Amino acid sequence: MRIGIVAVGRLKAGPEKDLVSRYLDRFAKAGPASGLEFSRVNELPESRASNSATRKREEAVQIEKSLPDNPLVVALDERGKSWDSQEFATYVGDHKDRGRRDMVIVIGGADGLDPDFRDRADLVLNLGKMTWPHQLVRIMLAEQLYRAVTILSGHPYHRS
């Protein structure tokens, strides 16, 4: 199963981007043994609309256009389920085993995700109840993807 990330907004060069790249490289190297492949990070421009609802709607249209055919969509949102790393790895592994071709994890813009898009997602997940800057969300997501692969492969990186 290919796993990709769609993110509204760009991650500038610097230590945060380097750390994201390091975890995604680890995922890309470890994933194939578990039947997982990293496709890419697709960065979309932020809407310049004057109000939040319009910005979220415009960004949702861009997100939808960027998705492959019939992907499993995981939306990151503060209203989502709170899972531990094992639950996330199990979810990824189960869908891979069912023959899903693509999973896309979506990070919304500064205003969050459009409610209609969020409601259509296959899974809405949060990375904790606190508010996180985009750079840290990307780092945490990249690390959790790598951790999921290590859990699925029985690698000792994850210690439960």
Swiss-Prot record:
Its EC number is 2.1.1.177. It comes from the Bacteria. It holds the Pfam family SPOUT_MTase. Its main location: cytoplasm. InterPro entries: Alpha/beta_knot_MTases, RlmH-like, tRNA_m1G_MTases_N. It is an enzyme of class 2 (transferase). S-adenosyl-L-methionine binds at residues 76, 108, 127-132. Keywords: Cytoplasm, Methyltransferase, rRNA processing, S-adenosyl-L-methionine, Transferase. It is found in: Cytoplasm. The keyword Zinc does not apply. SUPFAM superfamilies: alpha/beta knot. The keyword Protein biosynthesis does not apply. GO terms for molecular function: rRNA (pseudouridine-N3-)-methyltransferase activity. It catalyses: pseudouridine(1915) in 23S rRNA + S-adenosyl-L-methionine = N(3)-methylpseudouridine(1915) in 23S rRNA + S-adenosyl-L-homocysteine + H(+). Residues 44-63 are annotated as: Disordered. Specifically methylates the pseudouridine at position 1915 (m3Psi1915) in 23S rRNA. Homodimer. Belongs to the RNA methyltransferase RlmH family. This is Ribosomal RNA large subunit methyltransferase H. It comes from Allorhizobium ampelinum (strain ATCC BAA-846 / DSM 112012 / S4) (Agrobacterium vitis (strain S4)).
